[in-house]
Design a protein with these regions (language model features):
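Small/aliphatic-rich secondary-structure junction motif
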Residues: 3-49, 73-75
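Conserved beta-strand positions in the Rossmann-like core of class I SAM-dependent methyltransferases
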Residues: 34, 82, 137
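Short secondary-structure boundary segments
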Residues: 38, 109-111, 140
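Short, hinge-like loop/turn segments at secondary-structure boundaries
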Residues: 50-54, 100-102, 124-126
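A short acidic, glycine-rich active-site loop
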Residues: 52-65
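Structural beta-alpha unit
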Residues: 72-106
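Glycine-rich, Arg-bearing micro-motifs that act as flexible, cationic patches
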Residues: 105-130
Length: 140
């Protein structure tokens, strides 16, 4: 049923739960497993080149760490996890990569927000679900 699975990994608790589900599904369906981590860019408050460089260094270290942990977790279950870090807007980048990679399934974690926040900003998981070219599993 699923031959190629993509999991979104931002290092959050929701993403960790999504990774566990994605690993189990990859085992069950003997599917290839990929992860995408999105670096959303330099904060607007970064005023100097030094601050920008420090932010990028910290982001690089963070993504190396979470992806190393994800690869190790998958390996324990006998699954090879291919990781990618991409700069961009979270929703657009994940949806584009899902289309580009011809994935059968996208697994994402859910982060709860207040009703007001959801109305004003929309929900990342909701927007990904609307725009995704493939089946989406949202893990709570």
């Amino acid at each position: 049923m699923f031959k190629k699975i993509l999991v979104a990994n931002d290092g959050s608790d929701g993403a960790k739960k999504a990774l566990k589900i994605a690993i189990n599904l990859a085992k069950q369906y003997n599917a290839e497993l990929y992860s995408i981590s999105v670096e959303e860019g330099v904060p607007h408050y970064a005023a100097t080149i030094g601050e920008i460089e420090e932010f990028r260094k910290e982001a690089d270290e963070f993504f190396v760490k979470i992806n190393r942990e994800a690869v190790e977790e998958a390996k324990k279950e006998g699954i090879e996890l291919h990781t990618k870090v991409q700069a961009g807007h979270e929703v657009e980048t994940i949806v584009h990569y899902a289309k580009e990679g011809n994935f059968d399934l996208l697994v994402i974690g859910f982060m709860g927000h207040s009703k007001i926040f959801g109305r004003v900003w929309g929900s990342t998981s909701q927007n990904i679900t609307k725009l995704s070219p493939c089946t989406v599993v949202v893990v709570k």
